[in-house]
């Protein structure tokens, strides 16, 4: 008896210890969240002045952590290990709701994948012509080479995708922090002049309006919901009944890393420019690095901008691929199940990969203008799935009831409603 208890304690200790796979997932979560959007965040978050920026910096960690922890717990609440979000949704809410949410989940993530395929083609094309002085190959060939390159990583499976993303995080963070250090001598006091409530109210749209419209910017700057289901399933297989504690720990470290690196970069950029500069950059709809390169006449920044963007887009593409594949697979499986049929998962993954390759290549080649609007329409769906669905499940699903009664749940619902209302306002204003 004593030996059994000792071995059980030893087993729990070994599972609670930090592992190499935990680091890999931590960096994978970071890699999915921090995409090319980081290059626009200093403009979108800083244009309202320092007061809204400081408030957003305070809200960033709890908003990101509690929401993503809720979605992770939702996936972990499924009866059977190995169930992804599309299966858990059906288990908790029924077949009809399961099909609808799976469809919405796919169409919220898939357009982001298409946007990234266009973005990486545009970025590499521009880098070749402006920085390297080369004539880029025809767009159809260039986009095919780039997408096949990223899809090659996909062919090696989920572990390789997460490993590739975690490796790409290091050069990305390194270059971002070097750039931040490079900008410190350029600091001026203009941004600090907005460090009062009176000035903040007079800046841009006013303090409360600026904060309201900035919440969705923060949500999507730290959003990594497309990889959460894969993350939860993998950790449940590895840690069993300790998966929830382990997932929460990995999420916390990933979110601290996200908030610190991104907000340091944002504050340093904002302190290097005046509010008028940030407003001009927003009006021209260019990234912060493109604006800084022109503003300070710094060729080094002009070189760094596309390199940072290429790394950021690649790792975010891989993370979003996992979510899009899950949604597509879920739709196919549910459709076949309704007809009394099934399909082998490896075969389905190959079909999904081919579909993703062909469609992302066509869209990257054609570069349709409607794509941005489709991606924007997916915003409220992502916010609902990330913020509201897990909180609703806590009230309605017995397996989630143990997480009720916490003030953090109210916080997540409030932030979710603020984000969704601001997205709709931005869409229709």
Swiss-Prot record:
Catalytic activity: L-serine(in) + H(+)(in) = L-serine(out) + H(+)(out)
Any coiled-coil regions, as ranges: none
Topological type in the membrane: Multi-pass membrane protein
Chief localization: membrane
Any Gene Ontology CC annotation: plasma membrane
Sorted UniProt keywords: Amino-acid transport, Cell inner membrane, Cell membrane, Membrane, Symport, Transmembrane, Transmembrane helix, Transport
InterPro entries associated with the record: Amino_acid_transport_2 (IPR018227), Hydroxy_aa_transpt (IPR004694)
Transmembrane segments: 23-43, 47-67, 100-120, 141-161, 164-184, 202-222, 250-270, 298-318, 348-368, 370-390, 407-427
Subcellular location(s) of the protein: Cell inner membrane
Periplasmic side: 44-46, 121-140, 185-201, 271-297, 369, 428-429
Main function: Mediates the import of L-serine into the cell. Is energized by proton cotransport.
Record-stated family: Belongs to the amino acid/polyamine transporter 2 family. SdaC/TdcC subfamily.
Protein name, UniProt field: Serine transporter SdaC
């Amino acid at each position: 008896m004593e030996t059994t208890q000792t071995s059980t304690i030893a087993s729990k200790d070994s599972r609670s210890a930090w592992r190499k796979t935990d680091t890999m997932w931590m960096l994978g979560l970071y890699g999915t969240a921090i995409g090319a959007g980081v290059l626009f965040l200093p403009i979108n978050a800083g244009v309202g002045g320092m007061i809204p920026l400081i408030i957003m910096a305070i809200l960033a960690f709890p908003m990101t952590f509690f929401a993503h922890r809720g979605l992770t717990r939702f996936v972990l609440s499924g009866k059977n290990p190995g169930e992804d979000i599309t299966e858990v949704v059906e288990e908790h809410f029924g077949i009809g709701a399961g099909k609808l949410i799976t469809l919405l989940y796919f169409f919220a993530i898939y357009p982001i994948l298409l946007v990234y395929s266009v973005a990486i083609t545009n970025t590499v094309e521009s880098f070749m012509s402006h920085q390297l002085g080369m004539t880029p190959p025809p767009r159809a060939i260039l986009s095919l080479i780039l997408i096949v390159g990223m899809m090659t990583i996909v062919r090696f499976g989920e572990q390789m995708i997460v490993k590739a993303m975690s490796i790409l995080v290091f050069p990305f963070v390194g270059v971002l922090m070097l750039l931040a250090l490079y900008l410190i001598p350029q600091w001026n006091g203009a941004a600090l002049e907005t460090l009062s409530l009176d000035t903040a109210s007079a800046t841009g749209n006013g303090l409360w309006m600026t904060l309201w419209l900035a919440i969705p910017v923060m949500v999507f700057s730290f959003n990594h919901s497309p990889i959460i289901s894969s993350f939860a399933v993998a950790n449940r297989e590895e840690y069993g009944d300790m998966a929830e504690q382990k997932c929460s720990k990995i999420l916390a470290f990933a979110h601290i890393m996200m908030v610190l690196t991104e907000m340091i970069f944002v504050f340093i950029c904002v302190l290097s420019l005046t509010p008028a500069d940030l407003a001009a950059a927003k009006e021209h709809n260019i990234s912060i690095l493109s604006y800084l390169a022109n503003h300070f006449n710094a060729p080094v920044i002009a070189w760094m901008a596309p390199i940072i963007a290429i790394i950021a887009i690649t790792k975010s593409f891989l993370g979003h691929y996992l979510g899009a594949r899950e949604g597509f697979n879920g739709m196919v499986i549910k459709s076949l199940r309704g007809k009394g049929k099934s399909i082998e998962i490896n075969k389905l993954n190959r079909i999904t990969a081919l579909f993703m390759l062909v469609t992302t290549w066509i869209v990257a080649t054609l570069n349709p203008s409607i794509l941005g609007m489709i991606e924007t329409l997916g915003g409220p769906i992502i916010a609902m799935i990330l913020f509201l669905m897990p909180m609703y499940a806590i009230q309605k699903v017995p397996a989630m009831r143990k997480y009720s009664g916490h003030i953090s749940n109210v916080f997540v619902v409030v932030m979710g409603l603020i984000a969704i209302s601001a997205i709709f306002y931005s869409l229709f204003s």
